[in-house]
Amino acid sequence: MDLKNLSILIVDDVKTMRSIVQKMLRNLYIGKTLHMAENGLEGLKILHSTRVDLAIIDWQMPVMNGSQLLEAIRDDKHLRDIPVLMISGESEKDIVLEAAEIEVEGYLIKPLTPAVLDDKIRSIIHQIHHPDVATLHIRKARTFEEAEDLASAIEHMKYAAILKPKASRVLRNLGLLYQKIGNEKNMEKCLQKAASVNQQDVVTRHLLGEMYWAKNDLISAARYYLEVISLTKKFTDRAVLLGEALLDKNVIRLAKNIFSKIISKFSKDLSIIEKILDICIRQNELEYSKIILNGLIRDFPSNYDLIYKAGVVCETLGEVDNALEYFLTVEKHQGRRLDVKLKIAKLFYDKNKIIQADNYLNIVLRKNPNHKEALALRRLF
């Protein structure tokens, strides 16, 4: 295809960036028609309404980002063969891995130069119009799969795997075809081979983790999920649930390994770490909960809900002085909380400091004369 006659879609939320790419393409004499969109949703509307030979998509955008747009393109039978050049301002591993897994034809990091853009577009268009034999087999496999001729699909994917023995995606897709015909043994072999030839193939490792989890082989599932966590944040919610399942089965060391790896990856993400913390408290893993809380309180010293939880954990462990210190800290900053005052009263009672306990009980009962827990504690005096 003549590069001058291409219909190109440029999707970027920054107007100046769209203009820069447009100017570069004009100077390179690439593209006859240039369509512009400021987010993925607008870009998708253009793709559905007009012919596009190449899409140049920014990764980070509002409304619908580049990853979501790319996934929508690949999931649409009418759009999926459009070549995509992904552009990002970051070189983060997660972005590179995700772009590779959703089958992007090219990936560039800003700032762009005309020479690099020219080389990448020429390479993409050449690949599209001069596919290798393995790619032709992959396309035939897809056609047969959609026609529900799975036997033929498997044969063509096997040929592709022979021609590209180091292509983990081909091996993975072959495994998924075996899964469709109920051949789990061959599926497992293909996925394991895919994982072995590509140490960065996070999707295959995720599939293996899920497969072993479904078989209740939690140790094998955990082994693959530990690798997944090292590579990406994408499947974190599932990894947290697997950690909880491991605690349920009393496989404590592996559960802690998973949780610790997630926490190190999300060191500033309070919501994820609190989720893990709450699981550990529910499962009575209190010493590990203390370790998590110490880290959180160090990073979020004004989060008094965390300090309160630390008090509860220490109280449960029988560490009365530590618990009292935490609750007194909360009470100093959130003096209206009756639950905290009651905790302090109980701990003073445990320390046989009846006068201090009585003082805090009186405060609770003045606010709520019918407070059942406070009245029950008073009867112990």
Regions found by a protein language model. Give the residues of each.
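Two-component/phosphorelay signaling modules centered on CheY-like receiver
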Residues: 15-35
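Helix N-cap/capping motif at the beta->alpha junctions
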Residues: 36-45, 66-69
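Active-site beta3 strand of CheY-like receiver
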Residues: 50-57
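Receiver (REC) domain active-site loop signature in two-component systems and cognate sites
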Residues: 61
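Alpha4 helix (beta4-alpha4-beta5 surface) of REC/receiver domains from two-component response regulators
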Residues: 68, 91-106
